[in-house]
């Protein structure tokens, strides 16, 4: 049997009070529906049907080249009607897994348990026990066996006391699913075609109905408004923080960290408060991340340190390298072993060699800097001529004095010294001292202009 996943994502989400389709609202910097698609892919599904409606242009622009079949639900007439739109893409021998684009925290392990619970040619539904089941469809059992699902608005007083509720997530044999969908009626309080009605049909047809439950109820919570969205965000962040701690990271305060991607950590990593991780971030052993740092798609080697309020994006730090506080590493930047940049240093598309330092107030762009180099405060690599970028090469052992401009393309030879305040436009040979300052003048008795009173 092939696994065919149907994701329902057609709703507008009026209670979000937004022009953005509900399923595109983000959890951890990724749309809710993208979380669901990623989980479906992790199951090894052979096909994914994405049922869409409101905001089609925005959905397709956001999801881009996803490996999904786009299935239009022109009118939103209920969950059963939504699934029926995908009938043409469902084979009789498929196992059809039905998911929801606004339920982003469902786990692969839970869905595997649901699929494992389904007997051959039977169906399995994901249920959860809630202390306050108000608003949810109730699971109706007779002698322990599931016989149907009753929606809140259609339930009687006895049924309203049931605490086991329907999550909407189910695994159904393709052949029977299409038959049951064709038999759905909208004769109910909402005048909609309820997908849940197929459970009673399965019972009537003698089909086995099994159940599974998630490890946590938050997995099956949806977001209909921004308050619920924030609750899901916090649950996601709590789970992500716990994962980091179990893998060897020390979090100063697990409630004050934001993980918006995939973070891999070594042992004894220390992460201070209000740190943001985005994209793919790799931290080696004994790495220290200071408060307020932002790390995006970067690699930090063993014993390196990111000091407070430093931004590292698309960059690499070698062993025992350090950056910050208040430094910025832009894409293509690399600090080799024991290299250091300090406060208010920006480095882009450049390599700072082993043991080299730029302590403060410098811009390093499109540069190859060797080992043991000192970059003085206020140094700027002038890499852009208004049309093209040019390379600055600074070889091993160079000392660059404060307030120096290097006008690229230019090469500074080994162990050269550039005097403070110099503008370097030509190559410098090894071991040379170069000073380009104008001659200092002394004007005696100089009077500063006096501001005229109005």
From Swiss-Prot:
Subcellular location: Cytoplasm
Record's cofactor remark: Binds 1 Mg(2+) ion per subunit.
Domain of life, per lineage: Bacteria
Region (Pyrophosphorylase): 1-226
Annotated segments matching region N-acetyltransferase: 248-454
Binding site for acetyl-CoA: 377, 383-384, 402, 420, 437
Cofactor: Mg(2+)
GO cellular component: cytoplasm; membrane
Binding site for Mg(2+): 102, 224
Pathway assignment: Nucleotide-sugar biosynthesis; UDP-N-acetyl-alpha-D-glucosamine biosynthesis; N-acetyl-alpha-D-glucosamine 1-phosphate from alpha-D-glucosamine 6-phosphate (route II): step 2/2; Nucleotide-sugar biosynthesis; UDP-N-acetyl-alpha-D-glucosamine biosynthesis; UDP-N-acetyl-alpha-D-glucosamine from N-acetyl-alpha-D-glucosamine 1-phosphate: step 1/1; Bacterial outer membrane biogenesis; LPS lipid A biosynthesis
Gene3D superfamilies listed in its UniProt record: Hexapeptide repeat proteins (2.160.10.10), Spore Coat Polysaccharide Biosynthesis Protein SpsA, Chain A (3.90.550.10)
Keyword check for Metal-binding: yes
Annotated GO biological process: cell morphogenesis; cell wall organization; lipid A biosynthetic process; peptidoglycan biosynthetic process; regulation of cell shape; UDP-N-acetylglucosamine biosynthetic process
Region (Linker): 227-247
Coiled coil: none
SUPFAM superfamilies assigned to the protein according to its UniProt record, in alphabetical order: Nucleotide-diphospho-sugar transferases, Trimeric LpxA-like enzymes
Enzyme Commission number, as recorded: 2.7.7.23, 2.3.1.157
Pfam families (alphabetical): Hexapep, NTP_transf_3
Major localisation: cytoplasm
Bilayer-crossing regions: none
Protein function: Catalyzes the last two sequential reactions in the de novo biosynthetic pathway for UDP-N-acetylglucosamine (UDP-GlcNAc). The C-terminal domain catalyzes the transfer of acetyl group from acetyl coenzyme A to glucosamine-1-phosphate (GlcN-1-P) to produce N-acetylglucosamine-1-phosphate (GlcNAc-1-P), which is converted into UDP-GlcNAc by the transfer of uridine 5-monophosphate (from uridine 5-triphosphate), a reaction catalyzed by the N-terminal domain.
Complex and partners: Homotrimer.
Family from the record: In the N-terminal section; belongs to the N-acetylglucosamine-1-phosphate uridyltransferase family.
Name of this chain's protein: Bifunctional protein GlmU
Upper lineage: Bacteria, Pseudomonadati, Pseudomonadota, Gammaproteobacteria, Alteromonadales
């Amino acid at each position: 049997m092939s696994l065919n996943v149907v994701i329902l994502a057609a709703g507008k989400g009026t209670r979000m009070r937004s022009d953005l389709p509900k399923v595109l609202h983000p959890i951890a910097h990724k749309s809710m529906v993208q979380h669901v698609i990623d989980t479906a892919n992790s199951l090894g599904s052979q096909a994914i049907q994405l049922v869409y409606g409101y905001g089609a242009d925005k959905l397709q622009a956001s999801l881009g080249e996803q490996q999904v079949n786009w299935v239009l639900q022109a009118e939103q007439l209920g969950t059963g009607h939504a699934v029926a739109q995908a009938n043409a893409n469902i084979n009789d021998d498929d196992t059809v897994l039905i998911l929801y684009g606004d339920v982003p925290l469902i786990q692969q392990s839970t869905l595997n348990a649901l699929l494992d619970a389904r007997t051959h040619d039977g169906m399995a539904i994901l249920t959860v026990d809630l202390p306050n089941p108000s608003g949810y469809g109730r699971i109706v059992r007779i002698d322990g066996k599931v016989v149907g699902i009753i929606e809140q608005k259609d339930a009687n007083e006895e049924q309203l006391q049931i605490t086991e509720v329907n999550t909407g997530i189910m695994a159904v044999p393709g052949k029977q699913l299409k038959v049951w969908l064709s038999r759905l009626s909208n004769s109910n309080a909402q005048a909609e075609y309820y997908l849940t009605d197929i459970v009673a049909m399965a019972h009537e047809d003698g089909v086995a109905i099994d159940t599974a439950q998630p490890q946590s109820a938050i997995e099956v919570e949806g977001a209909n408004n921004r308050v619920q969205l924030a609750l899901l965000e916090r649950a996601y962040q709590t789970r992500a923080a716990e994962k980091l701690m179990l893998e060897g990271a020390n979090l100063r305060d697990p409630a004050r960290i934001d993980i918006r991607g995939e973070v891999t950590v070594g042992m004894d990593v220390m992460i201070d408060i209000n740190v943001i991780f985005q994209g793919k971030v790799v931290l080696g052993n004994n790495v220290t991340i200071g408060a307020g740092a932002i790390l995006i798609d970067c690699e930090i080697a063993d014993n390196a340190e990111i000091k407070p309020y430093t931004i590292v994006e698309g960059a690499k730090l070698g062993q025992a390298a350090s950056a910050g506080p208040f430094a910025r590493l832009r894409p293509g930047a690399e600090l080799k072993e024991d290299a250091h940049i300090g406060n208010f240093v920006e480095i882009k598309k450049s390599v700072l060699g082993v043991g080299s330092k730029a302590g403060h107030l410098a811009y390093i762009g499109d540069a190859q800097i060797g080992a043991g180099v000192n970059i003085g405060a206020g140094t700027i690599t002038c890499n852009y001529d208004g049309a093209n970028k040019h390379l600055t090469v600074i070889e091993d052992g160079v000392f660059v004095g404060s307030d120096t401009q290097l006008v690229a393309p230019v090469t500074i030879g080994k162990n050269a010294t550039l005097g403070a305040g110099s503008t370097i436009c030509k190559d410098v040979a090894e071991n040379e001292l170069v000073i380009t300052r104008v001659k200092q003048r002394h004007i005696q008795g100089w009077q500063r202009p006096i501001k005229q009173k109005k």
